[in-house]
Curated annotation (Swiss-Prot):
Gene: purC
Organism, scientific name: Archaeoglobus fulgidus (strain ATCC 49558 / DSM 4304 / JCM 9628 / NBRC 100126 / VC-16)
Pathway membership, UniProt: Purine metabolism; IMP biosynthesis via de novo pathway; 5-amino-1-(5-phospho-D-ribosyl)imidazole-4-carboxamide from 5-amino-1-(5-phospho-D-ribosyl)imidazole-4-carboxylate: step 1/2
Protein name: Putative phosphoribosylaminoimidazole-succinocarboxamide synthase
Catalytic activity: 5-amino-1-(5-phospho-D-ribosyl)imidazole-4-carboxylate + L-aspartate + ATP = (2S)-2-[5-amino-1-(5-phospho-beta-D-ribosyl)imidazole-4-carboxamido]succinate + ADP + phosphate + 2 H(+)
Enzyme class: ligase
GO cellular component, one term: cytoplasm
Family stated for the protein in its record: Belongs to the SAICAR synthetase family. Highly divergent.
NCBIfam families to which the protein is assigned, alphabetical: purC (TIGR00081)
Record's keyword annotation contains Membrane: no
Keywords: ATP-binding, Ligase, Nucleotide-binding, Purine biosynthesis
Domain of life: Archaea
GO molecular function: ATP binding; phosphoribosylaminoimidazolesuccinocarboxamide synthase activity
Listed EC numbers: 6.3.2.6
A GO biological-process term: 'de novo' IMP biosynthetic process
Amino acid sequence: MGSVKDLVVLKEPAEKPGLGRFIFSNRYSVFDYGEMPDKIEDKGRALCMVTAYFFEKLEEAGIATHYLGLVEGGKVRRFDEVENAVNEMEVKLVRVIKPKNGDYSIFKTLKGNFLVPLEIIYRNSIPEGSSLLRRIERGEAKPEDFGLTKIEAGMRLERPIVDFSTKLEDVDRYLSHSEAKEISGLSDEEFEALKELVVKVDEIITREVSKAGLINEDGKIEVALDDERNLMVVDAVGTPDECRFSFDGFEVSKELLREYYRKTEWYDKVRQLKGQEGWREAVGLPPPLPDEVREGVSNLYRAFCNEVTGRKFFDAPKLKEVVSQLKEVLE
């Protein structure tokens, strides 16, 4: 399925939805490399529980999702019904159709029940080192594209910027809104509804994580059209892998792992070779994480899950303590 979760297909999707189960693993991936050498203990269960929590919050707000429930003891249950953290989730399946050689014309012919081939990104702030700043520097985007006169590092935005990238290509690339609409297979009305949808999801994530003292900086969602062409949120949502959060100014997201690897010689090779044919083999195996970093990140996922969902699934220190320990280890 992917580098961080596995898919068990119970019924293949066609024009009507299929049925499947996600198995959230302890694997992680950075820089589109694929599976990294270490496992982050309890990450899979933590992400599964957080995703279920947010899918149910979205449904309460009238937002459709492909979520059907968590699997515990062979039974499908709601979040409040499970006794322990699990790593398995039952979902409706849609078709995932990969464009051939960059040709997205097939998406204009599909009636429904397919993954929209976009990552939909919201940005509530512009941190130092943001990819958006780099794109503006290179002339690939400009503030006016997002309804702003300027975009600077450290900005907090009054309303979120909505941004797009490809989802089903070997290396994701950012898209203008017109490019995103063109490849998506969506009508004008559906595309406008998609932009409104990501803002609503952003608001719900912001509200929920603020209870744990976290700030929602930016994040991404994936969306599908169901068999009646209604938009629904799919995959995973509201987790530190999908979003970038901060706690007392400290990064709480997968970005921590990226930052660690940016200091390695392995990353220098990734930066030089990424996107070329066979680049993953050419860069070689990444170095493993030091034990204290691996354990600190593991506790970060555990504490995030406990405090955002309001249920103590994991025996872990408080988020504040975990952040303090990680600061010492990483800085």
